[in-house]
Design a protein with these regions (language model features):
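Core subunits and conserved enzymes of cellular information-processing
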Residues: 1-131
Length: 131
């Protein structure tokens, strides 16, 4: 697999479109950090790291609105790919839906959202957009 982050986001998108409650994906340190951010920002209900074998898995419980049955994640898009990396400075930080969504960045200080990176005045690689 050439792009594990794109695979992770695609598995989440497919589970959302199929109205699954839980999706299980192979684990990596970068996927764990992205999952933590999605949980902190309220896009997923819960997550659990399962150490089964050398790699382990991440079980992600998707968040649905009980009244409308709509998922909290409306849009997931991979921005930087292995073939075409996208970097941004803190002054040129992308605004997702005029600040309503988040951009997840990989910086020298770790994986964080666009707002956290702008506060620390550091740029990085734009991994994905979520809203």
């Amino acid at each position: 697999m050439t792009d594990p982050i794109a695979d992770y986001l695609t598995r989440l998108r497919n589970a959302i479109m199929a109205n699954h409650r839980v999706v299980e994906v192979p684990a990596s340190n970068l996927k764990k950090e992205i999952t933590k951010i999605l949980f902190e920002k309220g896009y997923i209900l819960n997550y659990k790291f399962v150490e089964d074998g050398p790699q382990g898995t991440i079980k992600v419980a998707l968040k649905y609105d009980p009244a409308t049955k709509e998922n909290a994640i409306k849009f997931l898009k991979r921005v930087s790919t292995p073939g075409l990396r996208k970097y941004t400075g803190y002054k040129d930080m992308p605004r997702v839906i005029n600040g309503l969504g988040i951009a997840i960045l990989s910086t020298s200080k770790g994986v964080m959202t666009d707002k956290e990176a702008a506060q620390l005045k550091i740029g990085g690689e734009v991994l994905c957009y979520v809203y």
